[in-house]
Regions:
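Flavin-dependent oxidoreductase catalytic cores
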Residues: 1-358, 362, 366-378, 386, ...
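Glycine/Thr-rich phosphate-binding loops of Rossmann-like dinucleotide-binding domains
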Residues: 30, 140, 193, 228, ...
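Short, contiguous acidic/charged loop-to-helix segments that flank catalytic cores in large enzymes
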Residues: 233-239, 344-347, 352-353, 393-405, ...
């Protein structure tokens, strides 16, 4: 494990988490960048992790898995080796198309020997327990499930045959543990697919495994991947604890064995306590909740649960692995950067500064928080009468009000830290200079292009000044509600266009979404697991979706549409309104007016360049740490053209 990995885990243990279960590839050949416990050479590094966790009073289990999508290359710079499975099964996740190889009996034995060796390595490194991962389409589930398993030998067919691989593998792990380590099994309560197993089947599976005496605890999950990936990591559209009915239906099969479950989207310690009190499980697991707030447990124990950041289920922690190459969190930029930005790193700045932050979106809010934590005198100006910036826009879309939880947390923290907040005041450069600040953070965000410019066509749209046109801000902040036939031009493929479509269609409008993409949602939304929910909702309301299309221009109650591939055109007539949810452009005039007049001037987040929320909060955090540090760059331009270091 890297230093970043170890620091991330330690921050959670210090924050009160009692047990870490770390997911680890049981095979060396894996395409994922995560610890693998198979080569013996990895034992010393794993021991460092265990020793540090134990020194903080924590316990640590290793979750052994092999997943259909994890197959790595044959060697450096080589094509991928086949994914091993129970049978030939075709998968597709984010364009990663795979057909698993049906393992021979010799290959089954080799895989089981690999799991055994991995368990021995965990034992030698000092792990307290081992869990075999049999959910999410992992190999044990491929044998257990009739959806995957089409074998005709002793590993397929009847339930006892389909259980054989799992029981044999658990038997090997039990021998390795030798009573000195806990052994557990993670399994699905319901695969939620036709042809898969469901709660009654899962009850029988768990009963047989529990009766075998091979495990000390069960971890109950729901859904498989990739078919139900959006259920396996439920986004904001899904209520907290969505797994609970499935776990309740299966848990009695465990008998006296303790049951662990993530329950599907933990939002607070109070919710977890309620689940424990009801008896649905004996241990509550959390992943995203701890990414967002490492001190989740500690704060609750100390009576400070209101200081906890609440995971808003935006799922950028998952999507960022694909787009940023790192696991980033919208409301906790320190996640995976704990060695530099963790809880214990907020030492006083070299020089205490008077810091003015302009803009109350994610970048400005995080900049003000970090500035205050480092001892600066911070004032935040926001032109609107509320905080939130771009987060406010999306939180006003249907079923996304939970995003407000992040804004509420930032506001509470700024008040606790003594930040002066000036709402409803569009501060001028003259006012800023008159205040004689040492540093200014321009976090004034971005707005949707009134000219209809987008990343599909960066040019003015003919007719953009038509009286038919509405901007997203008019609808979400100004209360405009166009009626009749409404055309939405969705040029960015995020939540805004389709969210407004749902909002207006629910109020009776006839809505058509025109998008240059294959679907009206980008890969970023697909990766956050929102797409299935969004498309289902707008289709139920009768919204028409016109993919791979864009418009030439807006006329008198008509728009000219063309296919982005074939250039074929057609005209939509009798249009009552057009919404331009195209591209966003930075609002940063204050940067130009203040340039060269302030000792430190940082333009951050969407004001620097319109991007995702997590990038905005990251930049607010990063450059707030530069304030009052004479050896640091004094603008983002200086920082950009300075050679990178190991720091975030």
């Amino acid at each position: 494990p890297s230093d970043e990995y170890i620091n991330y885990k330690l921050e959670r243990v210090k924050g009160g988490t009692g047990l870490l279960i770390v997911s680890m590839s049981a095979l060396e050949r894996s395409r994922f960048v995560q610890p693998t416990c198979f080569p013996k050479e990895n034992v010393p590094a794993l021991k460092v992790l265990c020793d540090k966790v134990h020194a903080e009073g924590g316990r640590i289990f290793g979750e052994l898995w092999y997943w259909w999508g994890a197959a790595g290359p044959w060697g450096p710079l080589s094509p991928p080796a086949p994914s091993m499975g129970a049978s030939q099964t075709q998968f597709n996740l984010f364009g990663n198309r795979t057909t698993t190889r049906e393992m021979t009996k010799d290959e089954i034995r080799l895989m089981q020997a690999t799991f055994r060796q991995a368990a021995e390595n965990l034992r030698d490194a000092g792990f307290d327990g081992i869990m075999l991962h049999g959910s999410h389409g992992a190999v044990p589930e491929q044998f257990l499930s009739p959806y995957f398993n089409r074998r005709t030998d002793e590993y397929g067919g009847s339930l006892d045959n389909r259980l054989r691989f799992t029981l044999e593998t658990l038997g090997a792990l039990r021998e390795v543990a030798d009573g000195k380590m806990a052994v557990g099994f993670r399994m699905n309560c319901d695969e939620l697919v036709e042809g898969g197993y469901h709660t009654k089947d899962a009850w029988q599976i768990l009963k047989k495994i529990a009766d075998s005496g091979l495990i000390d605890f069960a971890d109950l999950d729901v859904a498989i991947e990739p078919d139900q990936y959006h259920i396996g990591m439920p986004p904001v559209f899904v209520d907290p604890h969505s797994y609970r009915p499935y776990v309740e239906a299966v848990r009695s099969a465990a008998g006296d064995l303790p049951v662990l479950s993530v329950l599907g989207r933990l939002t607070s310690i109070a919710d977890g306590e309620a689940a424990l009190q009801s008896g649905v499980c004996d241990m509550v697991g959390a992943a995203r909740a701890l990414i967002a707030e490492p001190e989740l447990v500690k704060n609750a124990k100390e009576g400070n649960e209101d200081r906890n950041r609440t995971c808003i289920a935006c799922n950028w922690c998952m999507a960022s692995l694909y787009f940023d190459g790192a696991q980033n969190c919208t409301i906790n930029p320190a996640s995976w950067r704990e060695g530099h930005w963790g809880v214990e790193t907020f030492t006083p700045a070299t020089n205490k500064a008077k810091l003015i932050v302009i803009g109350g979106g994610p970048a400005g809010l995080e900049a003000a928080r970090v500035g205050a934590l480092r001892g600066h005198d911070v004032t935040l100006y926001e032109a609107r009468d509320h905080l939130g910036g771009a987060l406010t826009l999306w939180s006003r879309l249907p079923s996304r009000a939970f995003y407000n939880k992040s804004i509420e947390w930032w506001e509470r923290e700024l008040k606790r830290l003594g930040v002066a907040i000036r709402l409803g005041h569009r501060v001028t450069s003259d006012e800023i200079l008159a205040a004689r600040p040492d540093a200014v953070m321009v976090a004034t965000g971005a707005v949707y292009s009134a000219e209809g410019r987008s990343n599909h066509r960066d040019a003015e749209l003919a007719g953009h000044d038509s009286p038919l046109v509405h901007m997203p801000e008019d609808i979400l902040l100004g209360g405009a509600r166009p009626k009749g036939k409404v055309i939405i031009i969705d040029g960015d493929g995020l939540h805004t266009g389709t969210g407004i479509a749902e909002l207006l269609a629910a109020e009776g409008a006839q809505v058509e979404v025109i998008s240059p993409m294959l679907a009206p949602l980008s890969l970023r939304v697909t990766a956050t697991q929102d797409t299935p929910y969004i498309l289902k909702r707008i289709k139920q309301l009768g919204v028409k979706i016109s993919p791979t299309s864009y418009i030439r221009g807006i006329g008198e109650r008509e728009v000219v549409v063309y296919d982005v591939h074939t250039e074929e055109e057609h005209t939509i007539r009798d249009v009552d309104a057009v919404v331009l949810a195209t591209g966003r452009l930075s609002v940063n005039q204050l940067e130009r007016e203040l340039e060269g007049k302030v000792a430190q001037l940082f333009t951050v987040g969407d004001a620097a360049s319109a991007r995702m929320w997590a990038t905005a909060s990251y930049e607010g955090h990063k450059f707030a740490r530069y304030v009052g540090e004479p050896e640091r760059p004094s603008t983002i331009g200086e920082a950009y053209f300075t050679p990178m270091t190991a720091e975030p």
